[in-house]
A protein has these predicted regions:
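Conserved short "hinge" loops at termini or chain/domain junctions
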Residues: 1-120, 133, 156-178
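Short Cys/His-centered divalent metal-binding micro-motifs
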Residues: 126
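Contiguous, low-complexity intrinsically disordered segments that are highly enriched
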Residues: 136-155
Length: 178
């Protein structure tokens, strides 16, 4: 994940369940990766070859990952993407991930690393999501002499369900699509 639920709670106060926040963070990670067309592989590449047997990654290499690192698993000569996973446990020559993973032979496991600007951008998106998502579609509210006008989320003002101004941090990470 880009940021853990514990890290998020240091910046945002919310009464949402940890599982709900984790799912939203995973959805934001997928959204950002698809939108930017960027895999965010750590440079220089930190990768190993491993076999996946009954959910355990087994390798002869030194494991360069630690608990809660994000990894991308790919397979084959064309590096077919098999998904992104979060490290759950590292033990000697094996490690496990939090998500279910199918058995595969000779998989390439690459560490995914996000910069602090991406982490802060995700925090801002989550804060907007928690505080303003329910107001989308409401232009204004008036009660007696008190009137409140909300940000307009139509047409050119929004992108992927978020205000464009909150997504500016992704511009340096955009990669061309061919």
């Amino acid at each position: 994940m880009i940021i853990s639920v514990e890290e998020l709670k240091q910046f945002i106060t919310t009464d949402k369940a940890d599982l709900v926040l984790e799912v939203r963070l995973q959805a934001l990670e997928q959204l950002i990766r698809k939108y930017t067309n960027n895999r965010f592989h750590q440079k220089p590449y930190v990768r190993i070859k491993a076999n996946v047997i009954a959910g355990n990654f087994v390798t002869d290499d030194v494991i360069p990952f630690k608990v809660d690192d994000t990894i991308q698993v790919s397979i084959g000569a064309d590096a077919t993407d098999c998904g992104i996973y979060t490290i759950k446990n590292v033990d000697g020559q094996t490690f496990t991930v939090k998500e279910d993973v199918p058995d595969m032979a000779n998989a390439t496991v690459t560490k995914v690393s996000y910069g602090n600007d991406v982490k802060m951008g995700v925090i801002n998106l989550m804060e907007w999501d928690l505080n303003n998502r329910h107001k989308v579609g409401v232009q204004s509210e008036t009660l007696s002499r008190h009137s409140v006008t909300y940000f307009n989320m139509d047409g050119d003002n929004s992108l992927m369900g978020y205000p464009k101004s909150l997504l500016g941090f992704l511009k340096p990470y955009m990669k061309a699509r061919f």
